[in-house]
């Protein structure tokens, strides 16, 4: 009868106001208790009983109480749940349905229900699903509760981890459907007939979505005329159509080890648009003359054409032939001549870029060899051999040409830009360089010319230490709608258009280039497409890293205790240890401080200068190569622990 009395309400409010409350994020442990992390320096203990009301990652408000002279946090209000939409593994016990969320720090089994819309889907223990959290104890419910919304895959799927990872990051798991009655929509565009030319393609032997074909011929005074034909999906896909919107949303083909999800329907990406051997295909073509020293003439020309590749070649075959290894031979003299001339183009353009732009140091690609059941058979390092460099030089040439044409004729497009060093950090760069006897001017370093000069100097050094130290002061590359320099490549302007089957921004540049030759109207891209491309690239890379880390951990698990030696590069130094990359297979591992030197007081891991000291003497530095073996592997969180030999 007194519960609504104003004095009683006032008294309750006064008591409430006296209690100290903190807002933070719940961090769980495998011991049952947890912590309320308020900031990087402050956290409060959450007893096991109270942890039953919350989940790792929840943002909550908690009351602080003193129990046995210790401050503890009692969860009170849910501000933001960690789980809303989530991926879970089906658990069935005593005919009751529950889910185990896909997260290494969440061990709670969450009761769940299957909606009527899935009544015909028989779920089994171990299947994977998408679910939404419906009930949370801090919202007044007795326990957590979730509703299943979609079956991802069954427990017997050998590639379940790939599909589950894609679902976890809310990425597509299947190729788009091919629309019925889709035909080429050239709308009066005249295509030149180049089907008699000996175009060749060079790619991985297993590649089906072939974007580019190349032809080289002699011009006047011994110059070489390079003709770069790029697949033309915009011949099939009208801007603003349903298929175009799907491609725009996906932004990229998503490549995972042994598994890819295309941006376009496979009928287009791997057949009708793919520049397959002996098949007549529509293409957008760039033709440019190259002088003996690799200089490009200003005669670059873009046009639409029909082409027919005369040979599908693989990187390994072509590299072996050029290097006089093995027994493979081109099918005829015409194909052999194309390879020879393309090799000449590569050497000249590479030499020109070393002198006038920048060339990245060759680093191997790492390829996972998977068995049919998805298990890792092996992981191999593939050096960037000559055939791959030949294609790269041709594509860079094509992109330089496109960037110049779009800049000079439109003033807009989708440009790949990189601004070099962060202007706010340039003084730190200068200080580091001067400490290593490299005299530089801050203003000059912020110019394209000055940046390139420094990069060339660093490339001549015997170690990568200094290069590694200053890379963290560089800005990230960006996609922009207006032309700008790409410091990383050492170029005044750069715009990609050579992968339209697998990258939507390249499709957009196709349309702009085609508008310049009379096909359609050139419309300035909206800036939101740059944000979409950047965000989707980030999501795809996270998913790729997730799958790769899991495969690495699964593969190296069997190496624990074997003392097999690996060469490794130190890529980062932290206060608590070193991060390394195994050079044989590309795996990232960590060496904790106690495995570097067992007397902690004698060890200094200096993150600021990238050096490890033992007893006051330098022992390791960033960029060094060391010998290690695998000490521990934890599959749940994909961590690989190594120890120095």
From Swiss-Prot:
PROSITE patterns: RIBONUCLEASE_II. Residues 563-645 form the S1 motif domain. Its EC number is 3.1.13.1. It is an enzyme of class 3 (hydrolase). Its main location: cytoplasm. GO terms for cellular component: cytosol. GO terms for biological process: mRNA catabolic process. Gene3D superfamilies: 2.40.50.640, Nucleic acid-binding proteins (2.40.50.140). GO terms for molecular function: exoribonuclease II activity; RNA binding. It is found in: Cytoplasm. SUPFAM superfamilies: Nucleic acid-binding proteins. Residues 191-517 form the RNB domain. Belongs to the RNR ribonuclease family. RNase II subfamily. This is Exoribonuclease 2. The lineage of its organism: Bacteria, Pseudomonadati, Pseudomonadota, Gammaproteobacteria, Candidatus Palibaumannia.
